[in-house]
Design a protein with these regions (language model features):
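N-terminal signal peptide c-region/cleavage motif recognized by signal peptidases
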Residues: 22-24
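Extracytosolic ligand-binding ectodomains
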Residues: 2-4, 12-15, 26-396
């Protein structure tokens, strides 16, 4: 029988070893990226686009040998646009799958709900679509939430600039959904207009699944607005267009990218001329990387005409997001959440959408966003297709 002191020593040593092993296991994550996006519901097009872009990047990375000698894989979850599901997915990706990072999807309400669990756990998050300003500029230090997508603060300035270019009387109306995304955009739009010495003549909100926007439309029309900015998804964007048609009001419409999915199908000819902010289009002159991604899209989906690609921005942003994460893992030298979070500030590369040099800046809270506003572009709905505005029938 061992002496008590010897037994106690061995138990203590075992405890230390187990503790060290647990720490090492916790630090060393798996070579997977968890994709928590909407692949069902009205924004399913967005999640499918993000999945496609991420898969193309992962295929390329793995064909070149993977990252730190390991092949990456994508683990897919559906948040269906529901914040509780997004939170649950985050915990599963981090604690059950032990992935190195989370990709975030379309809905800002989900991204806002993920802020707490992301930071409680300490897993890097890369937003690929949801544009709410405060989801990423969240005041956390260290901040584990990054984005390669649009940011509403910058989108508001972009859309306000476009609105004032085309307005004949400087009167702008704003239609926004009653969600974290829409409500978060209202102060951004007001601020962008105030910087130009203007203010909204109408700010009209609505809920998901509202069928008739006639009261809101009439108030905006009677306020004299000749341009309407939309912060809506396709479903409600369609209802606003139909209410405008019923009211006999035809303002110029400029929207955030929530109406970039199937508005042309839902609204038919009423969508013609509706302008939409995007971060990428496969219909412009393509770089070598763009041509390579187009070929991969055709191989995976059978789509040959770039005009038939839905949610091009989601595909392109997700593609670049995976490469930024892969670069950070290489710089970190390990599949370790904290090391990868720190390494993201050192990443610099020429991406599909834009050059990221550097991708992020730790000293500037605004630069948790990799994609700068000079790379935003304007597209327009025409005969059921979303095409570049420049050179379109509406570019007069």
């Amino acid at each position: 029988m061992l002496p008590e002191t010897s037994l106690r020593g061995r138990l203590l040593a075992a405890t230390v070893v187990l503790g060290l092993s647990a720490t090492g296991a916790f630090a060393q994550q798996e070579p997977c990226i968890g994709n928590s996006v909407a692949v069902t519901g009205p924004a399913a097009f967005s999640g499918l686009a993000i999945k496609l872009g991420a898969e193309i990047a992962i295929d390329e990375i793995n064909a070149a040998g993977g990252v730190l000698g390991k092949k990456l894989k994508l683990i897919q979850y559906d948040d269906a646009g529901a914040p509780p599901r997004g939170v649950d997915n985050t915990r599963r990706i981090a604690l059950a799958d032990k992935c190195i990072a989370v990709l975030g999807g379309f809905h800002s309400t989900v991204a806002l709900a993920q802020v707490d669990p992301i930071h409680e756990i300490g897993i890097p998050y890369m937003g690929v679509w949801a544009a709410n300003t405060k989801a990423i500029e969240n005041g956390r230090d260290p901040n584990f939430m990054f984005r390669i997508s649009a940011k509403d603060k910058w989108v508001a300035r972009f859309l306000v600039d476009e609105a004032l270019k085309v307005s004949k009387n400087g009167k702008i109306a704003f239609f926004y959904e009653n969600t974290g995304w829409g409500n978060g955009a209202l102060p951004d739009v007001k601020s962008a207009l105030a910087a130009k010495g203007k203010e909204l003549v109408a700010a009209e909100t609505f809920n998901w699944n509202d069928q008739d926007m006639t009261p809101q439309v009439i108030r905006a029309r009677d306020a004299g607005a000749d341009v309407a900015i939309f912060w809506a998804i396709d479903r409600e964007g369609n209802q606003i267009l139909r209410s405008m048609d019923k009211a006999g009001w035809k303002p110029t419409i400029i929207g955030a990218w929530g109406i970039s999915g199937n508005l042309g199908e839902l609204a038919g000819p009423l969508a013609n001329g509706v302008r939409v902010m995007q971060t990428y289009s496969f219909q412009t002159e393509q770089s070598a990387t763009g041509k390579k991604v187009l070929a991969a899209i055709e191989a995976k989906t059978g789509i040959k005409d770039p005009r038939d690609i839905k949610a091009a921005s989601g595909i392109a942003d997700a593609y670049d997001a995976v490469y930024l994460l892969a670069d950070a893992i290489k710089i970190a030298g390990a599949y370790d959440w904290k090391k990868v979070q720190a390494a993201l500030y050192q990443v610099s590369r020429d991406g599909l959408v834009a050059p990221y040099k550097p991708a992020f800046d730790k000293k500037d809270p605004e630069r948790q966003d990799a994609l700068l506003p000079q790379y935003y572009l304007l597209t327009v709905w025409h005969e059921g297709k979303l095409i570049p505005f420049k050179g379109s029938p509406y570019d007069k």
